[in-house]
């Protein structure tokens, strides 16, 4: 599996509580696709959400988002964890 960081750009800003609810929906859906949603970060004022995902591929990570709540990422990058 590969670590990915995805980026969501949400016009008009985003509330942390709404992202928390979406993350819970991801957790309920992730096993169907062999994906693990690990963490997320939110920039409420600028409408940015960043998710750290352990996934077989980028498409599987976005499929979870699509099925769980419909908010797919606009960008997704493979990343490596540093020491």
What are these regions (language model features)?
Residues 9, 52-54:
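Short hydrophobic/aromatic beta-strand micro-patches
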Residues 56-82:
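An amphipathic, aromatic/His-enriched active-site/gating alpha helix that lines ligand/cofactor pockets
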Residues 29, 51, 65:
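Functionally engaged cysteine thiol sites
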Residues 1-32, 36-38, 42-47, 81-83:
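Short S/T/G/P-rich N-terminal loop/turn motif that feeds into the first structured element of a domain
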